[in-house]
Regions:
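Positively charged, low-complexity intrinsically disordered leader regions
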Residues: 1-27
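Conserved N-terminal subdomain of the carbohydrate kinase-like
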Residues: 4, 15, 27-31, 38, ...
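Residues that scaffold the ATP/ADP-binding catalytic core of kinase and kinase-like folds
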Residues: 17-18, 114, 197-200
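Short glycine/threonine-rich catalytic loop with a Thr-x-Gly-x-Asp
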Residues: 37-40, 44-47, 232, 250-261
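A short, N-terminal amphipathic alpha-helix
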Residues: 41-58, 217-223
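Short, small-residue alpha-helix embedded
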Residues: 48-50, 54-56, 195-196, 256-261
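Conserved phosphate/ATP/ADP-binding segment of small-molecule kinases
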Residues: 153-247, 252-255
């Protein structure tokens, strides 16, 4: 039997509040929506749940508020097989929320998202200090940018010092220090985040411009990133590392109804 990898996810919980509408309101305007949904999410929780569904042993470290959203999100992750025993509760701050306006048309849907981090942003280095010794017991550490950057940089350095691979999804896009980039065994931005961090856009207007990809890849390698994975939406993904640059096409879909799914 294959060993189940032990994955540590240090990241966010966000309750998605999704309002679907034919047209997003202008400033000062009210429109009648099509429907409203709530969905437990957060980039960290989503990573944890998907890894658990793929068979990994997953421990989630994060923070929620002392409210219904916090309880729903931790229960949802636990029901997927994620160990949430290290998820803390901030009794003075609300759980994180993502407010999503989903503009639906006959051609698909576009989203506009406002994130209120809440308790995610009150998680401190002191709260996760126990990881400094425990982190060596994991096969991989996964993080995103919905926590305070000090927490992300500190945990990434602990993992690197312990020889544990680190995967970072730099979203939402934010400046990355050379120290943090050098800790990333795997960096997985989308094309917009990659352009911001590398200082060079990737043209996908007529297909993927591989010269742009090569420039971006070299920029990251020069700052210490070992392996780069760039997601390109309908244009697939790029994997770049010591073996070169590889472009993988995505599965073509006739219609995408919900980009938040």
């Amino acid at each position: 039997m294959l060993k189940r990898p032990k994955i540590l996810v240090v990241g966010s919980f966000m309750m998605d509040l999704i309002a679907s509408t034919r047209r997003a309101p202008q400033s000062g305007e009210t429109v009648v929506g099509l429907k409203f949904q709530t969905a437990p999410g957060g980039k960290g929780a989503n990573q944890a749940v998907q890894c658990a569904r793929l068979g990994a042993q997953v421990t989630m470290v994060g923070q929620v508020g002392d409210d219904a959203f916090g309880r729903i999100m931790t229960e949802t992750a636990a029901s997927a097989g994620v160990d949430v025993s290290h998820v803390s509760v901030d009794r003075n701050e609300s759980s994180g929320v993502g407010h999503i306006t989903l503009e639906v048309s006959d051609h698909g849907a576009q989203n506009r998202i406002t994130v209120c981090p809440g308790a995610n942003f009150t998680l401190s280095v002191e709260d996760v200090a126990w990881l400094r010794e425990e982190i060596r017991n994991y096969d991989m550490v996964m993080m995103q940018f919905e926590l305070q950057m000090e927490v992300i940089e500190t945990v990434a350095q602990w993992a690197k010092d312990a020889g544990v691979p680190v995967m970072i999804n730099p979203a939402p896009a934010a400046p990355m220090s050379d120290r943090l980039l050098a800790c990333a065994t795997y960096l997985s931005p989308n094309e917009h985040e990659a352009a911001i961090l590398a200082g060079h856009p990737i043209d996908v207007s007529g297909g993927v411009n591989m010269e742009d990809v090569a420039l971006v890849s070299r920029a990251f390698q020069a700052r210490g990133v070992e392996n780069l994975i760039i997601t390109l939406g309908e244009n697939g993904s790029i994997a770049a590392g010591r073996s070169g640059i590889h472009h993988t096409q995505c599965v073509k879909m006739d219609h995408v109804a919900d980009p938040t799914a």
